[in-house]
Design a protein with these regions (language model features):
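Transmembrane beta-strands of outer-membrane beta-barrel pores
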Residues: 21-27, 63-65, 79-85, 177-179, ...
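Extracytoplasmic gating/loop element in the C-terminal half of outer-membrane beta-barrel translocons
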Residues: 137, 187-272
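Repeated loop/turn-to-beta-strand initiation elements of outer-membrane beta-barrel proteins
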Residues: 12-17, 57, 68-69, 179-183, ...
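Conserved small-residue
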Residues: 47-53, 57, 64-163, 279
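Outer-membrane beta-barrel "beta-signal"
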Residues: 58-61, 78, 298-310
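Outer-membrane beta-barrel and related beta-rich outer-membrane complex signature
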Residues: 29-33, 73, 81-101, 191-216, ...
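Transmembrane beta-strands of outer-membrane beta-barrel proteins
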Residues: 15-17, 73-75, 79, 171, ...
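Membrane-embedded beta-barrel scaffold of Gram-negative outer-membrane proteins
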Residues: 1-40, 73, 80
């Protein structure tokens, strides 16, 4: 790992922070690779051969805009930009080596939607390029013939986007007025993409005609998509998952000297997950691994509490 950083502070440390550039190389990742015939008892072996590189910049700033006897305000902000790329997956360079299929999805048997490939970000989506009608509706089963051989085969799949964000932001702030205290924390993610597996596995008309003669649930997006059968590998289901999320807001009041002129009592209320702004069509764009199979939204919670110090 290589990094260059700078810590700074101004105005009697009322403004502090840091900036850092890093290059992080991860080596000897395990991969299941082919080996020449006759060199082993099997044609494939598990071995430490993979390399991954991360390059990025991190910036943070903490400030106290107001600091008075009865009123204070502090704020913290950070931003991280990072790019990852796989640099090696086999013992020797092999242009014909496709990569490592990963990212299992619901629908079909053994289907995957992601791949680790040299020269691309980890967990890149491996999909077909969807063709659309003039009205913007995807045309079922019609994809771009990327290799120009006149037919649609696995060779026409391409690596499209990735789950990791390009830029990530964080914000915290706290305002104190006399015995009142208000704090909040939020995050933003830009450039992360999500495979909407809920949509790909539920938004097609054949689900309405089940052979057991009972109705299944379908997504309302079926009206815009219009597929009769599932098209799991269409890039139509790879969607921008950029978001702005407010994690929590907390308001409290502290009663001083309530226990025989000593100690204090703090009463507070917290609203968790109060706000999410995103163009993603699913319930929540913040999913682990970039594959969304979640049919239940993240809960919004209200907490009340009391802290007593003697």
């Amino acid at each position: 790992t290589y990094n260059v950083g700078l810590d700074y502070g101004f105005l009697d440390d009322r403004i502090t922070g840091s900036i850092e550039y890093h290059i992080r190389e991860t080596k000897d990742l395990i991969n299941f690779i082919p080996v020449p015939a006759g060199t082993n008892l099997t044609n494939f072996i598990n071995t430490n051969v993979g390399d991954l590189e991360n390059r990025g910049v991190e910036f943070s700033i903490n400030a106290i805009p107001v600091r008075k006897q009865d009123f204070s305000w502090d704020i913290g902000f950070n931003v991280t930009a990072n790019e990852n790329k796989i640099t090696r997956l086999t013992a020797t360079d092999d242009p014909s080596y496709l990569g490592v299929l990963t990212g299992g999805i619901s629908g079909g048997v053994g289907n995957t939607i992601q791949i680790h490939s040299v020269g691309f970000p980890a967990n890149s989506f491996l999909v077909y390029e969807q063709v659309y009608a003039e009205n913007g509706q995807p045309i079922e089963g019609l994809y771009v013939d990327r290799d120009g051989d006149g037919q649609i085969t696995a060779d026409d799949q391409y690596r499209f986007k990735k789950p990791a964000p390009d830029v990530f932001f964080g914000l915290t702030t706290n305002v104190t007025y006399k015995n009142f205290d208000l704090s909040l924390a939020g995050r933003a993610s830009i450039g992360n993409y999500v495979y909407n597996n809920v949509q790909s596995n539920n938004a097609f008309y054949d689900r309405l005609f089940h052979p057991t003669l009972y109705l299944l649930n379908v997504q309302s997006d079926i009206n815009e998509i219009g597929f009769d059968t599932p098209e799991y590998f269409s890039d139509h289901f790879i969607q921008d998952g950029s978001f702005l999320r407010l994690d929590h807001i907390t308001l409290s009041y502290t009663f001083n000297e309530v226990f025989k002129k000593s100690g204090n009592l703090r009463v507070y209320g917290t609203l968790q997950n109060p706000l999410l702004i995103s163009n993603y069509t699913g319930l929540d764009p913040e999913v682990f691994g970039g594959i969304d199979s979640n049919i239940y939204p993240r809960s919004r919670t209200i907490l009340f509490g009391v802290n007593a110090n003697f």
